[in-house]
Amino acid sequence: VMISCDAAITYARRYAKLALEMAEKCSDPVRKKELLIIAQNCANVPEKGATGFYEACQSFWFVQQLLQIESSGHSISPGRFDQYMYPYYKKDLDSGKITREFAQELMDCIWVKLNDLNKCRDAASAEGFAGYSLFQNLIAGGQNEDCVDVTNDLSFMCITSSMHVFLPMPSLSVRVWNGSPHDFLIYAAELTRTGIGLPAYYNDEVIIPSLESRGLTLQDARDYNIIGCVEPQKSGKTN
């Protein structure tokens, strides 16, 4: 574990060094500022933990990428992105550190980068699974452990990113139940009618009882996400 963590830190530091070198040679003041921020972000995460939304996005990408590199990953699913990223987003938005538009741009960049990842396959598998789909399932909306709907601004922005980028990854899913906001369901349907095949819809009122019947506690079942194609599971407890 320590070796893996050290490797992740070393990997991020290489990007910090490269961004700093690029900034020193850059004559465009706007781009130079961007590169200096990137260098600082990569020096901080994942080693020191994210302090804001921009760093959280960078940390998310490093971790997702490293998991794929380590295992030639299949179904390395980001899960409830709108839930674990929201505290960073709200903090920075409330303080004026970022705008909603900039946060949306960062998310759009993540959506693009998720399509960079590929899986090394043998010849037969490559023929049967042609293309770049790695089943990186990212899910938005739904309820928390206390049966309270937790759809938030990022839930909508996840859908917006899929509209903007219009690429197969992430495999966007949404959780729906009788507490889902009507405008969230309508917005998800707007993406559906584009014909891209996203999002997939998962009914909390069916899936939560089914997970309980398989041995999960009610609290864990309410916090489910989707792995790979369609497999519901509690985050962090897949083994």
Regions found by a protein language model. Give the residues of each.
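Mature extracytoplasmic enzyme cores
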Residues: V1-E24, L35
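Charged, low-complexity interaction regions
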Residues: K25-P29
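Conserved catalytic cores of very large enzyme subunits
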Residues: V1, V30, E34-I37, N41-N239
